[in-house]
Amino acid sequence: MTKVRIEPGICGFTAIAEAEAAEEDFMVHLRVASGCAAVQEMMKALGSTFSAFAVCLTRPGTGPFYAYAAEHFPVHAACPVIAGITKCTEAECDLALRQDAGIFFEE
């Protein structure tokens, strides 16, 4: 199992994503906990089992989470939660190496 903490910034809705690879067909089971109602509704609507290829091996801004967000999320293009869910899935399914990522403001 792979677990990541996603700190989105000023909204304060920290998200915890957990991914567990299934043994067949590059499927992954995801659990995402967040105080954000939009993220909660997304996970409720999409379910918890996904093709790792459909989540990770897509062009930027595509895949099931971005497609849902484009239709249902409030306007906030910089929300890092979906990228965090994707990184968690990549690492769990051996589609990318584990490495922290971040956005840091510099003076």
Regions found by a protein language model. Name each.
Residues 1-28:
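Short, charged/polar N-terminal "headpieces" of proteins
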Residues 14-15, 76, 95, 103-104:
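Polyanion-binding surfaces on beta-sheet-dominated domains and ring/shell assemblies
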Residues 21-91, 95-97:
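Active-site- and interface-proximal helix/loop "cap" or "latch" segments in soluble metabolic
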Residues 107:
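Residue-level detector of a single, highly conserved position within proteins
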